Amino acid sequence: GGRIKRVSPQRPKVAKSTRVLDLKGKVLMPGLCDGHVHVTALTPDFSALARYSPFYTAARSADVLDGMLMRGFTTVRDAGGADYGLAKAVDEGYMRGPRILFCGKALSQTGGHGDVRAAGENFTFEGCFCCPGLGRIADGVDEMRRAARDEIRKGATQIKLMVSGGVSSPTDRVDSTQFSMDEIIAAVEEAEAANIHVMAHAYTARAVNRAIVGGVRSIEHGNLIDETSVELFVKHGTFYVPTLSTYNAIKAEGLKAGFPPELLSKLDDVLVAGGRALAMAYDGGVKMVYGTDLLGDMHRHQLKEFGLRAKVVSAAELIRSATCNAAELFGMQGEIGTVSVG
């Protein structure tokens, strides 16, 4: 069960008892894929999220997952927060939702995009593995290897690195680079040894280019890339996962949803630039994957990414980004992404 046995323009002969759906005039598509989600991000305030009860977070994630499935998404790649427990609950039918590909905790340097401590907070933060936060700290090559191996031990289907500053982190600049090249390469080596890939949060051309050269498989966001980045994307076969919908959602309703007001000024650095980066990548032939990165109550805008990208990208390329391109990035060709036999 669950497999396509035949694709044909002719209606097959079947027993009278067989259920037949006449979908003439309709379009049959593969299940959609979202290459950048945070199914446990119940609030856009990551400092608050890290203090939530893990049981409360898991319970509320059920609604997030159900909503994704009802929008047509049957596979999602979680970019920090979800672990094997949620993925297993969905696989075993205890929660209704899409298949979850998870990284566990995203890896961040001290003071990086995954470090949720404010400047005046001096407690030790190791990403407390029982808490619902999205990240964990790793400084230096040895810690990077240990952290990557630990997430792999817990079943991660990809490793997530924070290689630049971000909008939602309290103490870094969007234009900062994070992790040394040796640290990036160490994580990539550990992922490759386990036959999985690395996804990297990065905004500026400098951060993006370092990550691509270091061997990551996909760049997340990339709003501030330049032509040198496009050349590297194509040369290395790296995938690009823009996330335009989250910036528009935060701009429109972020404060109401709980986004920290002191961080809202960072949004201007990337909001308008996202469309330019998308056009640059599309014109340059970069292979792109659909992603949204929505948080809290803003998850309901998941389908709006299509409309935002449609201003730049062809309809055919949009569909590929959410189907066959995603399947290739995930290493799941033949399993998802196409309507084909098998």
Task: Cite the ranges covered by each PLM segment.
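Acidic, metal/ion-coordinating pockets
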Residues: 56-59, 63, 99-100, 122, ...
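Histidine/acidic residue-rich metal-binding segments in metalloenzymes
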Residues: 142-240, 256-258, 267-288, 334-337
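Active-site gating loops and adjacent loop-to-helix segments of metal-dependent hydrolytic enzymes
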Residues: 40-59, 66-69, 104, 110-133, ...
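Active-site environment of divalent metal-dependent phosphoester hydrolases
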Residues: 40-42, 75-86, 165-169, 202-209, ...
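Histidine-rich, glycine-flanked metal-binding segment
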Residues: 1-29
